[in-house]
């Protein structure tokens, strides 16, 4: 059998007898032959364009971390023909819809997307899926949208973990305050991550009957009106759970008012959060590794599109617990 015949069978082109196809496929199966994707892409000078659709990171420290991870992946995979275009929206739904319409009109091989506004994100993804290209979500998972990959934290389990951290060492009845701090344009009733974290938090106490009695109070505070916090809210409170990265707002109030003996659990390694963690005001921060999410999101598209590999559509990041004694070591470990 000639080399040309084998080449036509492997690349599925030209006319070849069924007998020769069976012979070549048997040898491929026996020896585990794999097509050299790199060589093929180089030979045809193939390019892969990915779109990244994220909130603007100016004034939003959290969103710089996934961008750092994306940039690292972009540099690493650029020699294999991968290029990335960025699309940013301001932190309001009008800006989001405007940029979403722009992204929908353009053609890419893959999309990395962080859903922030629930209804708008569902509508955008439902429309974008019609393009039939790979999509990866980071930070938040919209379970209503099927066949879309997600790389990020299991929000329900992270809330469950927060409940466990708050309950440690408590021997008698305790009072817990859940402070829900949002921007004016956010709605906790429609924010999937928020809901899942709070649901997981309550589930821990419900499922563990051996715990002492805990009493729960919820308050809603707008980020733009930080003076809504009052000392009265914290009377008799033993612990505070803030289900997002704005835990530093509560920590600042507690420190300035010299409120003692209140355990605080929140999320994310923002500088202000780390400062209060180091001061001993915040007890625990749950880290969702946003830089790794960004890197792994692009890596997912690279493996699926460039390497033609089968990849998992659901990858949960480990739940890392940061305390005063270990956060500096965590900061030293980079991608």
Residue ranges and their predicted role:
Residues 71-82:
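Signal peptide-proximal N-terminal region
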Residues 120-157, 270-278:
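Flexible loop/hinge segments that line or gate small-molecule binding clefts
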Residues 55-64, 85-96, 152-158, 180-200, ...:
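Hinge/beta->alpha junction and helix N-cap segments in small-molecule ligand-binding domains
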Residues 27, 31, 188-189, 205, ...:
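Hinge/cleft segment of the Venus flytrap/periplasmic-binding protein
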Residues 1-41:
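N-terminal helix-turn-helix DNA-binding module of bacterial transcription factors
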Residues 29-61:
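N-terminal helix-turn-helix/winged-helix DNA-binding helices
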Residues 150-176, 225-226, 289-306:
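Hydrophobic alpha-helical segments within soluble ligand-binding/sensing domains
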Residues 110-129, 215-271:
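Hydrophobic alpha-helical
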């Amino acid at each position: 059998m000639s080399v040309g015949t084998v080449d036509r069978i492997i690349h599925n082109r030209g006319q070849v007898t069924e007998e020769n196809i069976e012979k070549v496929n048997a040898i491929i199966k026996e020896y585990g032959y794999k097509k050299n994707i790199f060589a093929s892409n180089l030979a045809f000078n193939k390019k892969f364009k990915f779109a990244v659709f994220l909130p603007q990171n100016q004034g939003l420290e959290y969103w710089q971390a996934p961008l750092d991870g994306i940039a690292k992946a972009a540099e690493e995979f650029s020699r294999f023909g991968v290029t990335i275009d960025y699309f940013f929206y301001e932190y309001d739904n009008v800006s989001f819809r405007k940029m979403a319409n722009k992204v929908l009109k353009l053609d890419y091989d893959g999309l990395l997307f962080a859903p922030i506004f629930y209804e708008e994100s569902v509508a955008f993804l439902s429309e974008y899926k019609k393009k039939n290209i790979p999509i990866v979500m980071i930070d938040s998972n919209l379970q209503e949208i099927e066949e879309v990959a997600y790389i990020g934290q299991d929000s329900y389990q992270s809330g469950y973990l927060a409940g466990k951290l708050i309950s440690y060492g408590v021997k008698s009845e305790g009072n817990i305050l859940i402070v829900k701090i949002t921007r004016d344009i956010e709605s906790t009733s429609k924010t999937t991550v928020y809901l899942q974290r709070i649901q997981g938090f309550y589930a821990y106490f419900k499922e563990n009957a051996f715990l002492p009695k805990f009493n729960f109070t919820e308050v809603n505070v707008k980020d733009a009106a930080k003076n809504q916090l009052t000392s009265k809210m914290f009377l008799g409170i033993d612990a505070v759970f803030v289900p997002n990265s704005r835990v530093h707002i509560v920590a600042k109030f507690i420190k300035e008012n010299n409120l003692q003996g209140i355990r605080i659990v929140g999320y994310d390694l923002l500088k202000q959060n780390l400062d209060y963690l180091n001061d001993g005001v915040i007890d625990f921060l749950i880290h969702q590794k946003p830089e790794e999410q960004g890197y792994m999101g692009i890596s997912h598209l690279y493996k699926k599109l460039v390497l033609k590999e089968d990849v998992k559509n659901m990858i949960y990041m480990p739940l890392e617990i940061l305390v005063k004694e270990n956060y500096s070591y965590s900061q030293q470990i980079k991608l």
